[in-house]
């Protein structure tokens, strides 16, 4: 399948990447318009170390964060471009283990469908630069959203998913439900917000396997998947960003994606 071929090519490109060279947005956009090519939009700003961890790539050549990637070939040489949106900087590196013929083979079964990036057409300059526009106006499906923990049964399920047993001390408070277990406290608000407070003497709950960005993101991803992921309906979770906000402290943010489109909730 195209997915399996694309996955394999990306893993090989990351594993064999040469030292990257900085490029501007013009060259990056030219790469997006060059055939053959495989384009990856991660929707959020993923640290390269996290992407490598998820894809089981054992390489530290590439650094920074990546929002977009394109694997393309120029004069028989396969190139991997990526765009670091937070730094407004692009990078390119070569891969000597992938032949241009393999890239051609991966995309050979695809047919031209007229889709363009907004930057490729002057009449689309009012749109965000990397918006992809089809010739036909798509007809979106209408979805609705509800608070998945409004009922007591769902709240109890969430409590157990977060590792607070059914026999934990619990009581209602102003606009929320408070649960205590081994001096750890969980606040489940009526509007869906959940706050965890570790015991003052420290807690073994939600321990990470290491101190790096990959361990922080992966630990949070597993926790988010076993809670939010079980209550997200047809949406899936994606990583928006991961930032270190103090020594050993990380702010990891996830969002909802529905059929490839980012979902905005409330005041987002």
Whereabouts are the PLM-identified features?
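Extracytoplasmic beta-rich ectodomain segments of secreted or membrane-anchored proteins
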Residues: 209-268
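Preferential activation on post-signal-peptide N-terminal prodomains/segments
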Residues: 1-215
């Amino acid at each position: 399948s195209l997915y399996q071929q694309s996955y394999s090519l990306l893993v090989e490109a990351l594993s064999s990447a040469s030292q990257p060279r900085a490029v501007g947005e013009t060259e990056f956009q030219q790469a997006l318009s060059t055939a053959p090519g495989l384009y990856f939009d991660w929707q959020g700003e993923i640290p390269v170390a996290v992407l490598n961890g998820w894809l089981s790539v054992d390489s530290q050549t590439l650094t920074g964060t990546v929002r977009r990637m394109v694997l393309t070939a120029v004069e028989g040489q396969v190139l991997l471009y990526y765009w670091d949106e937070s730094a407004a900087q692009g990078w390119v590196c070569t891969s000597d283990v992938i032949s241009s013929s393999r890239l051609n083979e991966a995309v050979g079964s695809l047919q031209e469908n007229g889709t363009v990036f907004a930057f490729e057409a002057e009449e689309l300059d009012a749109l965000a630069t990397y918006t992809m526009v089809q010739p036909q106006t798509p007809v979106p499906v209408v979805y609705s959203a509800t608070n998945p923990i409004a009922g007591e049964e769902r709240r109890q399920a969430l409590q157990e998913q977060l590792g607070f047993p059914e026999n934990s001390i619990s009581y209602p408070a102003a606009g929320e439900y408070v649960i205590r277990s081994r001096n750890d406290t969980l606040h489940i608000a009526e509007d869906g917000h959940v706050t965890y407070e570790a015991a003052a003497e420290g807690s073994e709950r939600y321990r990470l396997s290491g101190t790096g960005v990959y361990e922080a993101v992966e630990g949070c991803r597993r926790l988010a998947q076993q809670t939010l992921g079980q209550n997200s309906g047809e949406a899936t979770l994606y990583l928006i960003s991961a930032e270190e906000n103090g020594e050993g402290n990380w702010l990891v943010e996830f969002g909802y994606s529905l059929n490839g489109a980012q979902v905005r909730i409330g005041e987002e």
